């Protein structure tokens, strides 16, 4: 799908919103939909992240997948609020001079054109701050979990050799880094699941 087609995708999204209570969300009336411990998620948050996620993930919203994508957006927002609490508790910050680098990395790692994504968001009057919140949370969470778990991980030569057999284009160091990142991600996912299990989540 081209980026011009993604602009048309937003028209589909807007139709979906019109047929849903989410369509009523705007910057003057934010209805609280979910409480996550002491954090809130409003209908406006859900509407904005629903649209932005569909753009980033290159998904065409239909009557068949709309409800599923809505639930995924809600679950992602719950996870994001839990992540933000931990990020604040550990005082993880992204330095201003590093923010552009991390933002560019976010788009490049997903093979997305940053300028075109920004233009689509602007043309369709979506909230760019919602995208920036997602990016900053993702980057800060990665920094936090690396700090928490990196020192607990040990990669064996056998694991490295096995990966190199499957892909001989990798260097020894790159193979080790890939395996390390995978282990950090697994521990990060479990950490988030544990936080969610302990959280007080109230849907209104």
Give the positions of each predicted feature.
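Sec/Tat signal peptide C-region and signal peptidase I cleavage site
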Residues: 21-25
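Glycine-centered signal
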Residues: 1-2, 20
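Bacterial N-terminal signal peptides that target proteins for export
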Residues: 2-10
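Bacterial N-terminal signal peptides
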Residues: 10-19
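Peptidyl-prolyl cis-trans isomerase
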Residues: 27-31, 35, 40-41, 64-204
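Short, conserved catalytic-motif segment at the N-terminal edge
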Residues: 53-65
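A short acidic/small-residue loop/turn micro-motif
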Residues: 48-50
């Amino acid at each position: 799908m081209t980026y011009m087609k993604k602009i048309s995708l937003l028209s589909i999204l807007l139709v979906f919103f019109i047929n849903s209570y989410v369509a009523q969300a705007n910057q003057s009336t934010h209805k609280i939909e979910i409480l996550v411990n002491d954090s809130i998620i409003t209908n406006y948050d859900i509407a904005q992240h629903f649209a932005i996620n569909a753009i980033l993930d290159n998904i065409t919203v239909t009557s068949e997948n709309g409800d599923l994508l809505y639930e995924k957006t809600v679950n992602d927002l719950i996870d994001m609020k839990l992540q933000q609490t931990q990020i604040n508790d550990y005082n993880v910050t992204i330095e201003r001079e590093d923010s552009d680098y991390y933002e560019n990395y976010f788009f490049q790692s997903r093979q997305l054109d940053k300028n075109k994504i920004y233009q689509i968001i602007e043309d369709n009057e979506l909230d760019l701050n919602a995208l920036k919140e997602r990016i900053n949370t993702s980057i800060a969470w990665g920094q936090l979990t690396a700090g928490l778990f990196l020192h607990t991980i040990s990669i064996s030569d056998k694991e490295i050799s096995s990966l190199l057999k499957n892909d001989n284009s990798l260097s020894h160091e790159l193979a080790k880094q890939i395996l390390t990142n995978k282990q950090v991600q697994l521990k990060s996912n479990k950490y988030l699941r544990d936080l969610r299990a302990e959280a007080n989540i109230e849907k209104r």
